[in-house]
Amino acid sequence: MTVVIPIGRGRSPAGASRERVGVLLVNLGTPDTADARGLRVYLKEFLSDPRVIEKQGLVWKLALNGVILNTRPRRKARDYLKIWNTEQNESPLKTITRAQSDKLAAAIADHGHVVVDWAMRYGNPSMRSRIAALTAQGCDRLLVVPLYPQYSAATSATVCDEAFRVLGEMRAQPTLRVTPPYYDDPDYIDALAVSIERHLASLSFTPEIIMASFHGMPQAYIDKGDPYQAQCAATTEALRKRMGLDASKLMLTFQSRFGFDQWLQPYTDKTVEKLAKDGVKRLAVVTPGFSADCLETLEEIAQENAEIFRHNGGEEFSAIPCLNDSDSGMDVIRKLVLRELQGWI
């Protein structure tokens, strides 16, 4: 939902009323429906992005339009059905991102004439449609907020790509700003620590180990200069210092690998399996790279990896929720946005 925070009116050189500032929260994406058709549309858009799959040659296109889009959508649809928000008929990521947008609008209501909206890089609501909506409402300045604490070309950069692609079709473009990654922001680290501590206090057991699981990516992308791995490590180290834990008690792993290439290691699922086989009975997993709970946290971690842990001898497993639209999570986003809006409001 678009939320407008009103103040006075002004006029642009073209004569239209344009004094508003747009803030667009952007997350990765979600299918419109939890079925094979919905997943096929979503995955085709996602996996056709050269920022996500860099080798977009003939071999990849044949594989994508052949085996992948004829098999993977059915499997992923079953996973989405396990976590689907049936009341609103949408994925949890969409529900949470909308809530983040609404709460941000309320939190910055005293800071001028701002329009807060939200979009998905893949799927709906699209960045194209929401940027058009913001400019139609008179926004001549636009702050794009990629909801990724750690930068990667496959996430933050493709948000920028799409924003400039949309602006490239406009004659009268809004002025554009993009928020930076916030992987080591003290407010973000503190919010993570408080969230973890509160969750652990609610459990009936004390985890022997906490695992910080981040979305993985091909090792080749890091070798080309992507800073993602270093930023994940920096987040984890800052969190260790904040919580007084060493690397044996707060472990860094990477999940969601896809395909046959080597991805960032250690792999989350393999580490979960090894810990259980080595005698660890109580494990908690936090996912600091996700600003909102989604398929990768609610199904892959909370269900798949919990089953791996128990199947191999583990007993107690808990997936720690993302910051989502919690007060501490929203405070991180609010401060980030207000910092980048300086001079505009």
Curated annotation (Swiss-Prot):
Q: Which residues bind Fe cation?
A: H215, E296
Instruction: Tell me where it mainly resides.
Output: cytoplasm
* Compartment annotation: Cytoplasm
Superkingdom of origin organism: Bacteria
Q: Which UniProt keywords apply?
A: Cytoplasm, Heme biosynthesis, Iron, Lyase, Metal-binding, Porphyrin biosynthesis
Give any GO molecular function from the UniProt entry. metal ion binding
Give the first-level EC class, as a single word.
Answer: lyase
Task: Tell me which family the UniProt entry assigns to this protein.
Answer: Belongs to the ferrochelatase family.
Supply the HAMAP family for this chain.
Ferrochelatase (MF_00323)
Q: What is this protein called?
A: Ferrochelatase
Q: Which organism is it from?
A: Nitrobacter hamburgensis (strain DSM 10229 / NCIMB 13809 / X14)
